[in-house]
Amino acid sequence: MKIVMTIMVRNEEDIIGENLEYHLNNGVDHFIITDHHSTDGTMDILREYERKGVADVRIEQSEEHHQAQWVTEMARLALSKYDASWVINNDADEFWIPQKGNLKDFFHTIPQLTYKIHVSRFDFFYKFSKDLKFYDAMLFREFQRRWTKCCHRALSDISVEVGNHDANSESMNIQGYGSSGTVDLIVFHYPIR
């Protein structure tokens, strides 16, 4: 099984390194990352992971933000170039946390007829000084369930919606494959940094 994570970034130097390390240590095999006009040190950090051979970094120069289109392209590339089994479309401030084991352990439990999974996301907000690392400072968790995030099997006809909240595959829908929700995987979101 191979897990590829896609990420859209813009000025994420404060969090992207820790995001990549966390997910590498929890079962992600490769990243496809699209940068859209970062002006901080984000690209320097991404190039380090590219040199290590675990990231494919793309740069979008468009003045417009075509997130759904770019994430769909990355998700399809995960299959065509990296032979992914599962794709997680992520944001730089989101951490995918399995309740047991790592991400590979989680995906091994998914029935073959499930092609996408909706995952609950919880927002964290600041309590203390911004001088602390983001995960130390953000101790308040919003317990109300927000928009779910969606991960999916690697498919050549996958289409990802804006915000990575859903994904669809006409071929899977025709064949009777479906989606499911889970409590065994959650997303922690650190939106204010």
Where are these predicted regions, by residue range?
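Short beta-strand-to-loop acidic/aromatic patch adjacent to the donor-nucleotide binding site
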Residues: 83-97
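Ser/Thr-glycine-rich phosphate-binding loops at phosphate-binding pockets of nucleotides
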Residues: 7, 34-42
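Short beta-strand/loop segment that forms part of the nucleotide-sugar
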Residues: 29-37, 58-61
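Active-site-proximal specificity loops/subdomain of glycosyltransferases
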Residues: 43-86
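N-proximal low-complexity "stem/linker" segments adjacent to membrane-targeting elements
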Residues: 1-21
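Short acidic/polar active-site loop segments enriched in Thr and Asp
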Residues: 29, 85, 115
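Catalytic-site signature of metal-activated, phosphate-bearing donor transferases
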Residues: 69-71, 98-193
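Short, acidic, metal-binding catalytic loop of nucleotide-sugar glycosyltransferases
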Residues: 21-30
